[in-house]
């Protein structure tokens, strides 16, 4: 018998699949997160959710709002754990200025796309997004269905020949 191949560990902690469904993603940027100790432990245990999170600007700094990190039962008991705390994003001044300028245009917002490990650091991928209308979502679904149908037709055509 052959040995099963071991899959490499994925570095992705949490994905925001809804963001790509609800928004056109214009630009993507990687940012660091300022976390507390109990948050790092919880993220390592996979208790993070970024489905409704977005970026706000306050006093020239960027903050991740709406991300939920559930505390572990074994985490530190002398610290009050707030799962939905606003977390500071670690970005260069140039990146901050660029994002702030782009996000102030009409119809644009900045949403969290994914949370992942990069070596020992937790990083969040944020995207400059513009909201989709209902018709745009329908067009995406039609396009996806046509691609599946086309692949099926091509597969059957290759089998016959």
Curated annotation (Swiss-Prot):
One of its GO terms (molecular function) is RNA binding. It is found in: Cytoplasm. Keywords: Cytoplasm, RNA-binding. Belongs to the SmpB family. It holds the Pfam family SmpB. This is SsrA-binding protein. Required for rescue of stalled ribosomes mediated by trans-translation. Binds to transfer-messenger RNA (tmRNA), required for stable association of tmRNA with ribosomes. tmRNA and SmpB together mimic tRNA shape, replacing the anticodon stem-loop with SmpB. tmRNA is encoded by the ssrA gene; the 2 termini fold to resemble tRNA(Ala) and it encodes a 'tag peptide', a short internal open reading frame. During trans-translation Ala-aminoacylated tmRNA acts like a tRNA, entering the A-site of stalled ribosomes, displacing the stalled mRNA. PANTHER family: SSRA-BINDING PROTEIN, TMRNA-BINDING COMPONENT OF TRANS-TRANSLATION TAGGING COMPLEX. One of its GO terms (biological process) is trans-translation. InterPro entries: SmpB, SsrA-bd_prot, SsrA-bd_prot_CS. GO terms for cellular component: cytosol. PROSITE patterns: SSRP (PS01317). It comes from Haemophilus influenzae (strain PittGG). Transmembrane segments: none annotated.
